[in-house]
Amino acid sequence: MTVRVRIAPSPTGNLHIGTARTAVFNWLFAHHHQGQFILRVEDTDRERSRAEYTENIKSGLAWLGLTWDEGPFFQTQRLDLYRQGIQTLLDKGFAYRCYCTPEELEQMREAQKAQNQAPRYDNRHRHLTEEQRQGLEAQGRKPVIRFIIDDDREIVWHDLIRGKMTWKGSDLGGDMVIARIADNPDQPFGQPLYNLAVVVDDMDMKITHVIRGEDHIANTAKQILLYEALGATVPEFAHTPLILNQEGRKLSKRDGVTSIDDFRKMGFLPQALANYMTLLGWTPPDSTQEIFTLTEAAQQFSLERVNKAGAKFDWDKLDWINSQYVHKMSGEELVDLLVPYWQEAGYPINIDSDRPWLEKMATLIGPSLTRLSDAAKESVLLFGGRVDYSEEAIAQMKQDGVKDVLQAVVEKIQESSQLTEDEAKDTIKQVTKTFKVKKGLVMRSLRAGLMGELHGPDLIQSWLLLHEKGWDKTRLTHGLSLVE
């Protein structure tokens, strides 16, 4: 048997972290078993579905490295297939036309509420005679299609994460609507609904394993009944834990960042985010291993090691994983990723003419980055001919003998248009010897004059970057003018 799984997002919003984590687990499972990963777009909600959300979902999955083997398939292009399934259920007596009005259904719910009963359809139109149906239609009523759910039925399945699952038919809310009222009088019924469309799709696409969030467990019970009624083999099911916020509630838009776009803009690398999502509910055989590619994770992945309990989203853990990936990247690899953040900060750069210089910048600040978005903050002292001086930097430059030291450095800079690392170190050595001061004083004073702060990235490498732009002389001269 070839393993076939699917991710089936609805394009009613941008790609959500929960959907993306489900996609990761499906992708890992498929690749572990040399199977196929299928993308299906469940776009039957025509009012809320948008083409731009579909593109966002596709680009988000691709950005994370979750390439699909088949698709994308769109449910709006498969309506005839669903109608065939509905007609089959009608012909076999597993479904019927229900003519209840919205007002009657509301009255039903209110009566149940008054008796402290859970709201459910009472199946009143399940056994209408042909004469009764004709009478209701003569009143101008249009039917929905309902699937019969036996209240006495016990639905049992073995969940690959949760073990034996049991659901009572009486807990499923009565006979289930599987098609809306027809918009077109030429059609026997209207828009097919979620549970019916999902089952028909999974049958047609020969899905062997349905891996999705635990919030779908009730749907699974309903869908098993539909598979059986349509004469199909029921796939295996696995219900993954929800992603929780730090308070233990389901992660939602109220928590702020939830879409993959949000994480991308915040400066997380796709491989780091995919790595983190892999661990968000799954424990590898070697529980000490935390850094791996999707391919490496797929080799070890099994549903048996997916947790049942909700997985708390840990920002510190994600930051740490992201930093591990960032710190392994060269300046050449980083530079194009950092440019947008420098540009957003308004730093004066030209990506074409400044590329070699920017690569050196990326090399310098790379080890201090946690997120790519930290680039603006970490390099703020390295852009421009002027810099704001902290009180500590001013105090450092006012120390006895420091002005002479810095002036000597300015003169050395003027003697040569080029500055190598060895020359920079030699200049510090010569000034230290000439003025008979400690090297530490020279280094602190030079940092204060060049950077405006007493702490920051490597001093020599920072100086070399500033010198390429001619900003070292400008800054030192300005700094000296402040302490005269």
From Swiss-Prot:
Cofactor(s) named in the record: Zn(2+)
Self-association and partners: Monomer.
InterPro entries, sorted: aa-tRNA-synth_I_cd-bd, aa-tRNA-synth_I_codon-bd_sub2, aa-tRNA-synth_I_CS, aa_tRNA-synth_I_cd-bd_sf, Glu-tRNA-ligase_bac/mito, Glu-tRNA-synth_I_codon-bd_sub1, Glu/Gln-tRNA-synth, Glu/Gln-tRNA-synth_Ib_cat-dom
Gene of this entry: gltX
Annotated Zn(2+) binding sites: C98, C100, H125, H127
GO CC terms, sorted: cytosol
Protein name (Swiss-Prot/TrEMBL): Glutamate--tRNA ligase
GO-annotated molecular function: ATP binding; glutamate-tRNA ligase activity; tRNA binding; zinc ion binding
Keyword Amino-acid biosynthesis belongs to the record: no
Catalytic activity from the UniProt record: tRNA(Glu) + L-glutamate + ATP = L-glutamyl-tRNA(Glu) + AMP + diphosphate
Similarity comment: Belongs to the class-I aminoacyl-tRNA synthetase family. Glutamate--tRNA ligase type 1 subfamily.
Compartment(s): Cytoplasm
Residue positions binding ATP: K253
A GO biological process held by the record: glutamyl-tRNA aminoacylation
Keyword NADP: no
Cofactor binding summary note: Binds 1 zinc ion per subunit.
E.C. number(s) listed in UniProt: 6.1.1.17
Root EC class: ligase
Residue interval(s) of motif 'KMSKS' region: 250-254
Keywords recorded for this protein, A-Z: Aminoacyl-tRNA synthetase, ATP-binding, Cytoplasm, Ligase, Metal-binding, Nucleotide-binding, Protein biosynthesis, Zinc
Motif ('HIGH' region) on chain: 9-19
Function: Catalyzes the attachment of glutamate to tRNA(Glu) in a two-step reaction: glutamate is first activated by ATP to form Glu-AMP and then transferred to the acceptor end of tRNA(Glu).
